[in-house]
């Protein structure tokens, strides 16, 4: 009996230690939970579980836990903290971005206007370590807008973009504004955050936040987005070409703003030579294909 009590105390202590370290323990697949759409890892091993819409709408409280799961073993690796979302929930969003080697992911929990929380989930055997990075991004963006507006209460939304590599570094670009509803009587301020979080070092190695203009914010937002060319439809090839040309010009303007003068001079020369090649192409379809590739190449420069 004495040994049983001691073992129970040790188990409780271990659970508390894991929680303090941000490590979530494994468990059974929760009832009425489904795999969140587009949350699976590239190798199909892991996914994020959310409560089904039917189950969530039938409960009294408004909170719905979210889990990281091992799909192959049909078990959970643990509850994801500071994330509250159920299937197809209105005015909220949940996005998952996986590293190429599936060893970690970024989970973005969105509210009505921008991200509420942003965390890195690093898989460790049958559990994971959660690191919250959204607070630093939010504070940096708010700081840039406070400086610009001279208002200590100034705050804005966060629209983040991520690139995850096999070097275990999370590259973040985020734009922000304080007036998402675009009220005419509210002066709008904009800001940009650029940062790199090193998982191995457990710290930000690069951070930069600055105020920007409305035009710069719009161009950067297009520049950082992952275009879905394959699933975008147009009435005809001419409309497609016009849309792609507008996108390319926005990304080019983003590069002009963000790059050092010497680096942009090289991009400008490359763009001039590329335009000659495009304009010499007679087929509209072929020109569109050239523009899609050029957009992606210019986007890579922004990172």
Which residues does each PLM region occupy?
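Positively charged n-region of N-terminal signal peptides that target proteins for export
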Residues: 1-7
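N-terminal alpha-helical modules
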Residues: 215-303
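Acidic, small-residue rich beta-repeat scaffolds with periodic aromatic anchors
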Residues: 22-40, 56, 113, 117, ...
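Extracellular-facing segments of soluble proteins and assemblies that are Gly/Ser/Thr-biased and enriched
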Residues: 92-129
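Recurrent small/Gly-Pro-centered beta-turn motifs in extracellular repeat architectures
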Residues: 51-52, 108-109, 174
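Short N-terminal edge-element motif at the start of the domain
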Residues: 35-98
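Bacterial N-terminal signal peptides
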Residues: 8-20
């Amino acid at each position: 009996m004495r040994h049983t009590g001691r073992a129970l105390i040790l188990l409780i202590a271990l659970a508390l230690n894991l929680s303090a370290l941000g490590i979530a323990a494994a468990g059974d697949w929760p009832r009425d939970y489904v795999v969140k759409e587009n949350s699976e890892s590239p190798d199909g091993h892991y996914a994020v579980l959310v409560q089904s819409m039917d189950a969530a709408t039938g409960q009294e409280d408004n909170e719905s836990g979210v889990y990281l799961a091992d799909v192959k073993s049909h078990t959970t690796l643990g509850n994801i903290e500071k994330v509250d979302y159920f299937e197809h929930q209105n005015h909220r969003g949940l996005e998952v971005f996986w590293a190429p080697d599936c060893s970690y992911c970024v989970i973005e929990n969105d509210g009505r206007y921008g991200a509420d929380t942003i965390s890195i989930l690093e898989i460790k055997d049958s559990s994971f370590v959660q690191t919250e990075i959204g607070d630093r991004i939010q504070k940096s963006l708010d700081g840039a807008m406070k400086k610009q507006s001279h208002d200590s209460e100034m705050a804005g939304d966060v629209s983040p973009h991520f690139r995850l590599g096999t070097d275990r570094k999370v590259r973040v670009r985020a734009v922000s504004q304080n007036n998402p509803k675009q009220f005419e009587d509210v002066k709008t301020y904009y800001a940009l955050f650029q940062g790199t979080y090193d998982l191995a070092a457990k710290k930000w190695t690069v951070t930069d936040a600055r105020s920007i203009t409305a035009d710069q914010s719009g161009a950067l937002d297009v520049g950082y987005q992952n275009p879905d060319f394959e699933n975008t439809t147009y009435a005809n090839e001419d409309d497609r070409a016009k849309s792609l040309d507008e996108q390319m010009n926005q990304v080019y303007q983003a590069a002009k703003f963000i790059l050092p003068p010497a680096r942009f001079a090289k991009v400008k020369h490359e763009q001039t030579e590329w335009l000659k090649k495009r304009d010499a192409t007679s087929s509209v379809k072929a020109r569109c294909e050239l523009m899609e590739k050029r957009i992606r190449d210019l986007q890579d420069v922004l990172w």
